[in-house]
Swiss-Prot record:
Any single GO BP term: killing of cells of another organism
Record PANTHER family: DEFENSIN-LIKE PROTEIN 1, DEFENSIN-LIKE PROTEIN CAL1
Pfam families: Gamma-thionin (PF00304)
Homology family: Belongs to the DEFL family.
Function: Plant defense peptide. Has antifungal activity.
Entry keyword Metal-binding: no
Protein's cellular compartments: Secreted
Keywords, in A-Z order: Antimicrobial, Defensin, Disulfide bond, Fungicide, Secreted, Signal
This protein's encoding gene: Def2
Full protein name: Defensin-2
Predominant location: secreted
Positions of disulphide bridges: C36-C82, C47-C67, C53-C76, C57-C78
Signal sequence, start to end: 1-33
Highest taxon of the lineage: Eukaryota
């Protein structure tokens, strides 16, 4: 019977730690959030290099950018966290 008294607090502690870790992971996912996509206003031509696209997007005030397909061509799109 003494073993049952010791196991219960340890099980409760384990579940509490598991809950805290799970909640912590959920907060990180929410903090990352969605990224909003906007066509670059300054990038000209067919987008081949995402590095060039990213650099142009940074001059437009966006943290990043990449070449993405748009219908039949590749265009430069800039990304920022959605409000």
């Amino acid at each position: 019977m003494a073993g049952k008294g010791v196991g219960t607090p340890l099980s409760a502690l384990f579940l509490l730690v598991l809950l805290v870790v799970t909640i912590g992971m959920m907060e990180v996912q929410v903090a990352e959030g969605r990224m909003c996509k906007t066509p670059s206003a300054k990038f000209k031509g067919y987008c081949v290099s995402s590095t060039n696209c990213k650099n142009v997007c940074r001059t437009e005030g966006f943290p990043t950018g990449s070449c993405d397909f748009h219908i039949t061509s590749r265009k430069c799109y800039c990304y920022k966290p959605c409000p």
